[in-house]
Amino acid sequence: MNIHEYQAKQIFAKYGVPTPKGLMAESVKQAVANAETLGGSIWVVKAQIHAGGRGLGGGVKLARSLEEVEQLSKEILGMTLVTHQTGPEGKLVQKLYIEEGADIKEELYLGVVLDRAREMPVIMASTEGGMAIEDVAHNTPEKIIKIAVDPAIGFQGFHGRELVFGLGITDPNEQKKLISFASKLYKLYMENDAEMIEINPLVKTGSGEFLALDGKMGFDDSALGRHPDIEDMRDISEEDADEREAGKYGLSYVSLDGEIGCMVNGAGLAMGTMDTINYMGGTPANFLDVGGKANAETVAKGFEIILKNPKVKAIFVNIFGGIVRCDRIANGILEATKLVDVHVPVIVRLDGTNAEEAAAILRDANIANVIAATDLADGAAKAVAAAAQAK
């Protein structure tokens, strides 16, 4: 689950992570009132959406008067903001964050993410703050510092020293401040079951203070039961409607850009299926894991969600029955053909528990556009061929 910048900064405040003062607004009038409340002569008007690249997309603007705050708020609030992370459809801006200006001397990058290969959190930092960290990683990877932190010992002084030396910070007072900053950020990450925390930019001010000028946070959905205060921050309007609908039926769904719909049981098999489709020359339109409790209703709902995507030219159902029974999947496919206009070829590979019964169910139904596959490679090849033929 992701949250907005203004919410991330509320959490920063609880942990003593320094940020500029700011207030959220849902109207132009409220934005101007917030600027008056904050005081000063310079404010930053920020679009609040769940995506990075807001500044380059025109969603972060500097205002030097209350009139300018009003003008910029009118421009940004209600706009469809397109960034490199939103896709071409963009996101509707429904909230603003009005923040006091900061005396920026230097921009850095600081984040904490989970390194799945090392199986531990990693602190990432760079002197290239304010830029897309993906671009820095691609073009100049040597400018990114990565410090693995073993959860068994937590953030220690030697981690902090590696951080400040790596960033070239030599002033003892500044070193102490940044080490304290990073220590608080790591504590926040661990105590809240975060998956990712990113501050870009982390700025050093003219007085040598460090401030989180931005804040992105993502949390482990499976751990939200331990953090009701964070779950209350969920903004459903920022989430994909199909993903939310799938979740109601116990389906894990992620929309992608390809043209072959995928329905698989198990995340590992789902990723392997998508890799095989790519290897065969196709592109997956989605990730859809029906899980171990799939029945006819959930399978039918999966078809309905997949077919909402007009790009889908074929569907590949790849089930290896262990907990989930293949005959239930077969009945779900039949149910889907009754409830939904399944107008594309459906390639079906069923193996494992009750696979023979499932094959008989589909064979007896004799549905013209349901095509049997013998294994993963055969199914992927047939799906790619069917999608190509439908173009």
UniProtKB/Swiss-Prot annotation:
Protein name (record): Succinate--CoA ligase [ADP-forming] subunit beta
Binding site residues for ATP: 46, 53-55, 99, 102, 107
Organism the protein comes from: Sulfurimonas denitrificans (strain ATCC 33889 / DSM 1251)
Keywords annotated in UniProt: ATP-binding, Ligase, Magnesium, Metal-binding, Nucleotide-binding, Tricarboxylic acid cycle
PANTHER family documented for this protein: SUCCINATE--COA LIGASE [GDP-FORMING] SUBUNIT BETA, MITOCHONDRIAL, SUCCINYL-COA SYNTHETASE BETA CHAIN
A UniProt-annotated Pfam family: ATP-grasp_2
Subunit comment: Heterotetramer of two alpha and two beta subunits.
Binding site for substrate: 265, 322-324
